[in-house]
Amino acid sequence: MEWVTATDGLAFVRVASPSAAEQAWADALAPAINAAIDRYLGSYLGIPSDGEAEIGALALRAFGYGWKYREAPFGEASYVDQAGQSVRLAGDWIVPIKPALNRWRDMGQLLG
C-alpha cells in the first residue's frame, strides 16, 4: 500500500524545490518505506480508516528518519530535538515507529 509518497515526504521534510539528487532519493525512499511497513504489518486487511491515517502519519516520520540518515550513510545519523537533546537514528528507518505499528499488525497471520 502507498503509505507515503515522495511528494508528501518532501513536504514533510520541508524541501520545496528538491535538487535532482534530492528528488531521486525521495523517489527511492518512499517506496522503500512503504514496502518495509507492508512487510512488517504482514496483512493490512481489515485496518480501519483511522488506522490507515495513523500508519500514514507514521510513514511520514519514517521518511523523515530516512531523509536524515542520508546525511551519514556510513556512520551514525542524529539530530538535536527542540529540547536540545541529541537523538540517534536507527539504521532501520521503521524501528522508531514499530511500537505504534504493532497496534495494526496481524499477529494471527504472523504466528501461523
Tell me what each language-model feature is.
Residues 1-112:
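Divalent metal-cofactor coordination and adjacent catalytic microenvironments
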